[in-house]
């Protein structure tokens, strides 16, 4: 055998062995969920979703330091019920009130991992009321539920006892949750510490993000002020600036206009956008919106009877396909003198738009 090939094979073998060894050293963490119908044995993905698993384990073992005082030092899940059961969908538990609205006294972040999907029966996942609202409630699926991907954190899977999952009825109880650690990495995983540290890290990230956002808003506001000083003005008081001229036909008010937009307050604060990069820059990315195709051009109708804000319609009708423009709407061409949809009364708005097409 050629010596170079031999060396390459040896190196690949060593590398593969090291990877396998590292994986074995990480170990596995199991949760044995004893119910009144039998035992459900699950694996917890502590490497991929460490915060979510740390939350579950520390609640189960009674050493979670973030819970409300009434739950401290108690094995949180013991004695709770499966308060929500939907046949051929899932079983849900972990609510101390049994109503679906209870919590341990805090919320924490989502941990979405591309490789972890709701792609089979026995998926263990977090229930929530929207982004960043995880608490103690979890569910286990009866079947694959792909529409939940990107909205709920998958943090484990059923290894044994799927038949028990399928027998659970509303009101059935969790008798005990036992956490089993197998392997050195699993035994080193300090759930209570990991979970508490997560809040400290999140607080630091939040402060850093606030500083970054403040600078971004100031920069955007300066740009808008400069453009406004150079903008054209219509008889109604709308001002517009063409950032980039397209070469398409003029917008036809009888057609549906496909347009990207980002709408801002005058201080540079972003209200809403269809543009993914802008949402990410402002830390306003919504995974559920992305899953539903929400970062795509909207369909706008700009005829006289169409229900869109007046200044937005007027601004689009000035433009051609391919144009990128900034529209400055005085409050009376936007949402008017009263508060609307969380927008303060008499708010002047700024739209950045791109006319993509019309049909």
Predicted regions, residues:
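Bacterial Sec-dependent N-terminal signal peptides
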Residues: 1-28
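Cross-family detector of peptidyl-prolyl cis-trans isomerase
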Residues: 18-359
């Amino acid at each position: 055998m050629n010596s170079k090939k031999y060396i390459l094979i040896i190196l690949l073998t060593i590398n593969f062995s090291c990877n396998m060894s590292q994986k074995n050293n990480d170990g596995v963490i199991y949760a044995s969920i004893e119910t009144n119908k039998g035992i459900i044995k699950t694996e917890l993905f502590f490497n991929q979703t460490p915060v979510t698993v740390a939350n579950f384990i520390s609640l189960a073992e009674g050493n979670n330091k973030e819970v409300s005082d009434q739950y401290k030092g108690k094995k949180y899940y013991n004695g709770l019920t499966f308060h929500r059961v939907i046949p051929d969908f899932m079983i849900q538990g972990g609510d101390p009130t049994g109503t679906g609205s209870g919590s341990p006294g805090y919320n924490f972040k989502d941990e979405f991992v591309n490789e972890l999907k709701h792609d089979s029966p026995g998926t263990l996942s977090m229930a929530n009321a929207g982004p960043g609202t995880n608490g103690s409630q979890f569910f286990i699926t009866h079947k694959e539920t792909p529409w939940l991907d990107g909205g709920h954190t998958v943090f484990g899977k059923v290894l044994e006892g799927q038949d028990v999952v399928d027998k659970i009825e509303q009101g059935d109880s969790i008798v005990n949750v036992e956490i089993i650690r197998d392997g050195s990495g699993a035994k080193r995983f300090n759930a209570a510490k990991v979970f508490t540290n997560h809040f400290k890290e999140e607080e630091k990230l939040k402060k850093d993000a606030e500083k970054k956002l403040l600078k971004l808003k100031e920069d955007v506001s300066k740009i808008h002020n400069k453009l406004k000083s150079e903008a054209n003005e219509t008889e109604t008081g709308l001002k517009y600036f063409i950032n980039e001229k397209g070469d398409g036909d003029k917008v036809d008010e009888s057609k549906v206009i496909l347009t990207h937009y980002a709408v801002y307050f005058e201080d540079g604060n972003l209200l809403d956008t269809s543009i993914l990069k802008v949402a990410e820059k402002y830390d306003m990315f919504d995974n559920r919106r992305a899953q539903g195709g929400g970062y795509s051009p909207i369909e706008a109708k700009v005829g006289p009877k169409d229900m869109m804000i007046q200044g937005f319609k007027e601004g689009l009708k000035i433009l051609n396909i391919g144009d990128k423009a900034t529209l400055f709407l005085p409050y009376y061409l936007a949402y008017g003198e009263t508060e609307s949809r969380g927008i303060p009364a008499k708010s002047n708005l700024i739209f950045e738009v791109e006319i993509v097409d019309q049909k």
